[in-house]
Swiss-Prot record:
This is Uncharacterized protein AF_1680. It comes from the Archaea. It comes from Archaeoglobus fulgidus (strain ATCC 49558 / DSM 4304 / JCM 9628 / NBRC 100126 / VC-16).
Amino acid sequence: MKKFMINCFVHLKEICYLSDMDILENMVKNLLKYESEVHKLLSTYESAGKSRIIRLDESYKELDGLSIEQDELFREALRCVENGLFRAAHVLAWAGFIDFLHSILALHIPQIKNKKEKWKISKKEDFREYPDFQIIEAAKDVGILNKSEMKTLKGLLSKRNECAHPSDYFPDLNETLGYISELLKRIKILQMRIKEK
């Protein structure tokens, strides 16, 4: 819509007198403000998909502080949301989160080796050899997560698994945005916790 209005404005500018230009500029500014307000209102309704996509800009802004790989996984998840691929969005968002958790665990390898004697780990990539369920428990064992956080993450992992494997679970737009938002909030909490230590 903005592109259309700008194109109209350019063409009108060519045929209007200078005094009329002030009126046109004012009209375009007001139309852009109006469009923004309409999107804000419509984004609260489930069926307003186009306006809801505008709200994804806020989710994209939440990706600060992630590695390149994690950022790309979350961006892919958000692109899936934009295209209605909600199950895929869950899987990709979880992949971004678990990569973040692997990064944190890599800072605690000696403590993890003490708790998980059979684990053969020396670098971040080694954590990929273990199931996500065990990774979450290891994070709790070394004090990265508390018991409540561990349970929450196991629940989020279960949602991811429902989306990654054949099931009757088909999340909608709101569930998917909530899932991604929850994972991003968990990352922010863990980032703050790391800074405090």
